[in-house]
């Protein structure tokens, strides 16, 4: 059995899909379906069982026998960069991760988990998996950063796989439940379908991010599991592309426009990553050599999926 926490969420459900694609269906999805809309991410997937997150935490803390587990993909977290309840964030993203990590270490179970490029904070270069380059801007980034530090202390003595992925700007199918935290491509597509012009913040040609397609993220997770590699790795394309490029790809798909520009929100100033670009040196050195989709390629595939029944 494989366990995927956050398995009804965005990246988690795409990992479940990737596992299904290689014939793996003995999957336990762990999630919190208080937001019932997330069920749609699972309806076309094959899983063996579902477990509520609170029940799962209680079970692993109690040390319950959950049978043979081939791996745990830990994608469950609060991923809102605008959430400022630090206790909630640390319980969800830090303590929960530690509980699962020790459950895996005690049983020799491969543990692959979601970290984040938010650990790098507001820097504009050297997005390298090293402490000197890490300075998160918000409590979400701090929760991910602190768990990475915790893992770094344990890695040298660990007898089983521990692998963290610093996700950059992930976009693609199954993110609709994320609301305001969904990708720019998702929101621009909705605006056009509602008969509006797509909207970007003023200066979006200067805001550049490393946008990575969620199918590529799932491929990275499966490859590292299948190859037993441990460490903390950036998971991006190694390219910085502008929000304008995303808008151009959406407009090109719909053959509509023009793009409207709106004022940059005051509340985001100083807490917004204006530039990200993954350094893939360590990822490539580990042996992962597959190419990553460009924004133009990924957005086209995503919008084809999003608009399949429109």
UniProtKB/Swiss-Prot annotation:
Positions contributing to NADP(+) binding: 10-11, 31-32, 38, 53, 75-79, 92, 144, 170, 178
Needed cofactors: NADP(+)
E.C. code: 5.1.3.20
Question: Per the UniProt entry, what is one GO biological process?
Answer: ADP-L-glycero-beta-D-manno-heptose biosynthetic process
Record GO terms (molecular function): ADP-glyceromanno-heptose 6-epimerase activity; NADP binding
Enzyme class name? isomerase
Q: Which domain of life is it from?
A: Bacteria
Has UniProt tagged this entry with the keyword Isomerase? Answer: yes
The record's listing under Pfam families reads: Epimerase
Give the catalysed reaction(s), semicolon-separated: ADP-D-glycero-beta-D-manno-heptose = ADP-L-glycero-beta-D-manno-heptose
The pathway that the record names for this protein is:
Nucleotide-sugar biosynthesis; ADP-L-glycero-beta-D-manno-heptose biosynthesis; ADP-L-glycero-beta-D-manno-heptose from D-glycero-beta-D-manno-heptose 7-phosphate: step 4/4
| Cofactor-binding details, from the entry | Binds 1 NADP(+) per subunit.
Q: Which InterPro entries match?
A: Epimerase_deHydtase, Heptose_epim, NAD(P)-bd_dom_sf
Question: Binding of substrate: at which residues?
Answer: 169, 180, 187, 201-204, 209, 272
Entry keywords, A to Z? Carbohydrate metabolism, Isomerase, NADP
What is the active site of this protein? Answer: 140 (proton acceptor), 178 (proton acceptor)
Complex formation: Homopentamer.
Q: Say what the protein does.
A: Catalyzes the interconversion between ADP-D-glycero-beta-D-manno-heptose and ADP-L-glycero-beta-D-manno-heptose via an epimerization at carbon 6 of the heptose.
- HAMAP family cross-referenced by the UniProt entry: Heptose_epimerase
Write out the similarity annotation: Belongs to the NAD(P)-dependent epimerase/dehydratase family. HldD subfamily.
Domain comment in the entry: Contains a large N-terminal NADP-binding domain, and a smaller C-terminal substrate-binding domain.
From the Swiss-Prot or TrEMBL record, give the protein name. Answer: ADP-L-glycero-D-manno-heptose-6-epimerase
